[in-house]
């Protein structure tokens, strides 16, 4: 693994930095306050080619890999965009683009990938009220009827479902009690949205208010058989393949948010004087920021390794989960101590740190909880007994 970025990768970083300049913290402050989708930001991501980075050139994409996607996400996030720098790319490019690219047939690729490159928004219909971390407990049922499937069920906490033109929907095609093994019986479908059989209800939430997260109610949704992604009953393995790049994306977001907060805290700590000296000269403020910076850089390297392995088709679950554990804790530490550096201003909306605090804490809960990532490391890296 060469740590020197190629000329092409450096161009990705530069282009992401240029895009971020047009969307400063005030822009995001207003979008979050007014619960407005950032239409012009999404258009900028599409026009710059970031949405199609991982999609082959023959479909209109950049023909690059997850490593380059991570660079774009991290740069957009750390330059000024906060979690939005990763959020929309993960929803569409990872959930939609990578899933279709890796597991779709040629007709599905021809149908969806060019449209994704042009800005077709996607969402992932995975989580259910009784199936969060326990994905195998999914109850949304898809019943085969002739040349189509009829789907009924409920999903929750589905981000982007209100705007998505496509949903990767995780269903159960064989009841759990009838499946030959627990990991069989799930199937994935590509669903065109919006759809009269799919009711979408936004959930009021703590942050990221420029993107809606929704309850989704599915009633007699009819999906053609040709919209089945991969093999029937083997969707669990496709879900697993999506989870690693999802974790890498959120690691990039946590690291990027941490870097953004540290940068702003350092600027303030150099200018703000208390007792006749810049507050940055006091170890109580300086050392926590320095420690967070060191941890973030370590997390970035581990995340790069995970993406490098993924792009070569090598096992990367250990690296992806460890990167998320380290990046999230470092990012939260960085934003927390940035807030302490700003003092009372850190709690004020106009200084943005409180928004980054609301955003970075999501990375500890999603796309997998901190505890589930640690469980993976304990069981699959250390070889300890299953802990749940």
Can you name each region flagged by the protein language model?
Residues 93-103:
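Helix-loop "lid/cap" segments that line or gate small-molecule binding pockets
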Residues 137-139, 194-224:
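Flexible, small-/acidic-enriched active-site or ligand-binding loops
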Residues 214-241:
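A short, charged helix-loop
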Residues 64, 134-136, 160-165, 180-184, ...:
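Short glycine/proline-enriched turns and hinge-like loops at secondary-structure junctions
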Residues 148, 152-201:
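A short core secondary-structure module
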